[in-house]
């Protein structure tokens, strides 16, 4: 009789939200936002693989690929508004810490923060 193979559990954590009344001087600065995403990955104990950014109108969209998943920021300076999504796999990561670092750096006066457990069920 063969033994049962036990697969390691996938631990997925996602923190996402909307940031209001942000510092407009930061929201349109692609290079500054790239640095914020890089530092957020470090704060969340994630392994940064690559960062891509696009200037779209006055705003910027940033996608950071981390070994554990991704971090995104999309900004609308004309509305002092940004959205942020931090998703990571692995018990060693802290997407909440990365999200809150971004909130602080964008100087959001108010924000929503949602958390989702994206772990496996097997």
Swiss-Prot record:
<feature type="active site" description="Proton donor; for catalytic activity">
    <location>
        <position position="89"/>
    </location>
</feature>
<dbReference type="InterPro" id="IPR003826">
    <property type="entry name" value="AdoMetDC_fam_prok"/>
</dbReference>
<keyword id="KW-0456">Lyase</keyword>
<feature type="active site" description="Proton acceptor; for processing activity">
    <location>
        <position position="74"/>
    </location>
</feature>
<dbReference type="Pfam" id="PF02675">
    <property type="entry name" value="AdoMet_dc"/>
</dbReference>
<feature type="modified residue" description="Pyruvic acid (Ser); by autocatalysis">
    <location>
        <position position="69"/>
    </location>
</feature>
<keyword id="KW-0704">Schiff base</keyword>
<keyword id="KW-0949">S-adenosyl-L-methionine</keyword>
<comment type="similarity">
    <text>Belongs to the prokaryotic AdoMetDC family. Type 1 subfamily.</text>
</comment>
<keyword id="KW-0670">Pyruvate</keyword>
<keyword id="KW-0068">Autocatalytic cleavage</keyword>
<comment type="function">
    <text>Catalyzes the decarboxylation of S-adenosylmethionine to S-adenosylmethioninamine (dcAdoMet), the propylamine donor required for the synthesis of the polyamines spermine and spermidine from the diamine putrescine.</text>
</comment>
<comment type="subunit">
    <text>Heterotetramer of two alpha and two beta chains arranged as a dimer of alpha/beta heterodimers.</text>
</comment>
<keyword id="KW-0745">Spermidine biosynthesis</keyword>
<feature type="active site" description="Schiff-base intermediate with substrate; via pyruvic acid">
    <location>
        <position position="69"/>
    </location>
</feature>
<dbReference type="InterPro" id="IPR017716">
    <property type="entry name" value="S-AdoMet_deCOase_pro-enz"/>
</dbReference>
<dbReference type="GO" id="GO:0005829">
    <property type="term" value="C:cytosol"/>
</dbReference>
<dbReference type="GO" id="GO:0008295">
    <property type="term" value="P:spermidine biosynthetic process"/>
</dbReference>
<comment type="pathway">
    <text>Amine and polyamine biosynthesis; S-adenosylmethioninamine biosynthesis; S-adenosylmethioninamine from S-adenosyl-L-methionine: step 1/1.</text>
</comment>
<keyword id="KW-0865">Zymogen</keyword>
<keyword id="KW-0210">Decarboxylase</keyword>
<dbReference type="InterPro" id="IPR016067">
    <property type="entry name" value="S-AdoMet_deCO2ase_core"/>
</dbReference>
<dbReference type="GO" id="GO:0004014">
    <property type="term" value="F:adenosylmethionine decarboxylase activity"/>
</dbReference>
<keyword id="KW-0620">Polyamine biosynthesis</keyword>
<protein>
    <recommendedName>
        <fullName>S-adenosylmethionine decarboxylase proenzyme</fullName>
        <ecNumber>4.1.1.50</ecNumber>
    </recommendedName>
</protein>
<feature type="site" description="Cleavage (non-hydrolytic); by autolysis">
    <location>
        <begin position="68"/>
        <end position="69"/>
    </location>
</feature>
């Amino acid at each position: 009789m063969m033994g049962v193979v036990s697969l390691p559990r996938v631990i997925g954590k996602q923190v996402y939200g909307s940031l209001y009344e942000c510092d407009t001087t930061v929201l349109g600065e692609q290079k500054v936002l790239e640095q914020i995403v890089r530092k957020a990955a470090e704060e969340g104990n994630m392994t940064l693989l690559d960062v891509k950014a696009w200037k779209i109108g006055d705003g910027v969209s940033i996608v950071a690929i981390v070994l554990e998943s991704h971090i995104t920021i999309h900004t609308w300076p004309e509305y002092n508004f940004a959205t942020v999504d931090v998703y990571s796999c692995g018990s060693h990561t802290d997407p909440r810490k990365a999200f809150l670092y971004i909130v602080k750096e964008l100087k959001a006066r108010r924000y929503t923060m949602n958390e989702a457990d994206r772990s496996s069920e097997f």
